[in-house]
Amino acid sequence: MAEILAATGLQTIESPPVKAFRPIFNRVFTVDTPIYNFSAGPAVLPESVLRTAQSEMFDYNGTGFSVMTMSHRSDVFMSILYHAEQDLRQLLHIPDNYKVLFLQGGASAQFNMTVMNLSNGFKRVDSVVSGNWSRIAHQEMGKLSDVDIHLAAHGGEMFDYTDLPPVASWDIDPSSAFVHFVINETVHGLQYREVPKLGADMPPLVCDMSSEILSRRVNVADFGVIYAGAQKNIGPSGTTIVIIREDLLDRCSSRVPDVWNYRSHINRQGMYNTPATYPIYISGLVFRWLQSQGGVEHMETINTLKAKTLYAAIDNSGGFYRNRVAPAARSRMNVIFSTGNQELDELFAQESTTRGLRLLRGYKSMGGMRASIYNAMPLQGVEALIEFMREFQKRYG
């Protein structure tokens, strides 16, 4: 090989040294030790879903194939896709005049796809900035379009992201293409508890619902478009759900490339290109799990209890733990808190890991702690976290 490389004038490149494996955590866990994953995403999945996927990994339903290796155009996968959509429709009570797509590119791709598809013939899009992800969306939306991305409200300027811009304060033009907002902000722990009501003469709502979809009841008919990355409350990363009102498809211009064009994806039954087959399959298993739990209605009850219990532990800590968010705007999905001391916060993150409470560090720009308590997080996980919080306070308070 060296002679061949020398003849071609190419040089050999030494491989970097292989580093010895170091376990991330310094405690050995047994199968009986409960592990609770508080990651903001990719996030916890129901154990029964993982075990079903495990049992079907090599042979899905007697086909002799794994879903990972199955043709996306096979009858078997088309059935998986069909049932995933139907189960999602049932869970969210999606009206017949809405289309459902399983796309790729994450929710971030929708920042531009919504503008490219829905602003044809319009001069303005209204954008509400309420936290980190809506801020990024606002920055991204205008990059591939000449339409004016108008800042309708800014929660950072109004409240330093400790409260949400009231809907009454949104500066909305009735002639705008749509109003974009993020209903739950994972970084700042903010959530609109009530869906904004804009009126029939106002632009349609386009909502990033990534971190709360299926966690509570919503009226899909209140929205023009709902989109959600799967990796928080649905399934593994790799697929993005888009729910779009049918009449809005008339805005999709043929000048938008097919891969970014909602109408092109719908006209091809979601098969314009190869969809994320395995994430769709896992998402379908999660939808069935949600149905077995009593649907979104039951999950809303459990999620409300989990959040209420955890916030009570923070508020009743005598100031040792702090949450700066206005109570009415507190997220039920992403609970942020801190001790007010960076060294103590880091110690909390380290020690909680040894107790099986994983990935509690706050977002990199925020610090502190963040407990993401999505649908698949059991109440027992929240109770285990609270128990550790009290023990930690006794030692260092």
Predicted regions and their residues:
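PLP-dependent enzyme catalytic core of the Aspartate aminotransferase-like
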Residues: 5, 28, 35, 354, ...
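A glycine-/small-polar-enriched, mobile loop at the entrance of the PLP active site in fold-type I
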Residues: 34-85
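Active-site phosphate-binding strand-loop segment of PLP-dependent enzymes
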Residues: 41, 141, 154-213
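Conserved N-terminal alpha-helix of the aminotransferase class I/II PLP-enzyme fold
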Residues: 64-110, 117, 132, 139-140
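PLP-dependent aminotransferase-like
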Residues: 108-179
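Conserved active-site segment immediately N-terminal to the catalytic lysine
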Residues: 206, 220-231
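Active-site C-terminal subdomain of aminotransferase-like
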Residues: 230-311, 326, 395-397
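Conserved PLP-binding catalytic core of the aspartate aminotransferase-like
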Residues: 321-352
